[in-house]
């Protein structure tokens, strides 16, 4: 079943057109990746879906509802959460305080269960619960950013460059956790410059070039595509 459908969206930063007719889908429980070079429009696509940088034209449908003009905070409530590039943790707040912000639109006993779930996924966050986020390593901050997004109980998790600037051993752990999150029923739309890693994690992918979808296929086909190999896989 299609959970997210993006249809011919164009997104602008002032006079600059960053997205030039992007269309894509994500099914319930699926992992889909966007790959491409810097400036291809990957992060802007996530920002448009999440409502942070609204699309100028086109439509975005989530769970059967048009969310193209829905404010970002309402999109979170409807079930889409973004873990942004660069993590954007609040450095002077503790791990627990950062996580609590992810649930600030929610009420009820389920929040305590979600803290437990995040701590089960990322034991380091439990160990550093009272530590200031600004004193943590890049990998730990990435765990915190993903954990904070999960506190919103999303149906769709948007991950923007989760391996950026992180030691390889922590990249492995984060991708293991992404797999666990997906197996729990959360669909994931993943942006990565590490195309090998992204295609290994996803069932399908879209290659973006200068704000357009240049290629869309299953991950195995993209892995074997000579153009993708030359441009993004280092082969």
Model-derived regions, located:
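Glycine-rich phosphate-binding loops of nucleotide-dependent enzymes
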Residues: 2-235
């Amino acid at each position: 079943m299609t959970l997210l459908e993006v249809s011919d969206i164009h997104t602008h930063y002032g006079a600059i057109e960053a997205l030039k007719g992007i269309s894509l889908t994500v099914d319930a429980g699926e992992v889909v990746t966007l790959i491409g070079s810097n400036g291809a429009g990957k992060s802007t696509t996530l920002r448009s879906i999440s409502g942070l940088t609204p699309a100028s034209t086109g439509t975005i449908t989530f769970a059967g509802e048009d969310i193209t003009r829905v404010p970002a905070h309402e999109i979170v409530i409807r079930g889409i959460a973004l873990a942004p590039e660069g993590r954007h943790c609040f450095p002077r707040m503790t791990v627990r305080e950062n996580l609590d912000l992810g649930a600030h639109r929610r009420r009820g006993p389920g929040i305590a269960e979600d803290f437990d779930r995040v701590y089960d996924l990322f034991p380091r966050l439990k160990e550093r619960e009272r530590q200031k986020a600004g004193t943590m390593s890049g990998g730990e901050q990435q765990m915190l950013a993903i954990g904070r997004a999960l506190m919103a109980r999303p149906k769709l998790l948007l991950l923007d460059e989760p391996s950026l600037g992180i030691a390889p051993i922590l990249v492995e752990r984060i991708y293991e956790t992404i797999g666990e999150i997906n197996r729990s029923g959360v669909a994931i739309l993943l942006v990565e410059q590490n195309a090998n890693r992204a295609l290994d994690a996803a069932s399908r992918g879209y290659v973006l070039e200068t704000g357009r979808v240049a290629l869309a296929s299953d991950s195995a086909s993209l892995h074997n595509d000579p153009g993708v190999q030359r441009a993004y896989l280092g082969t």
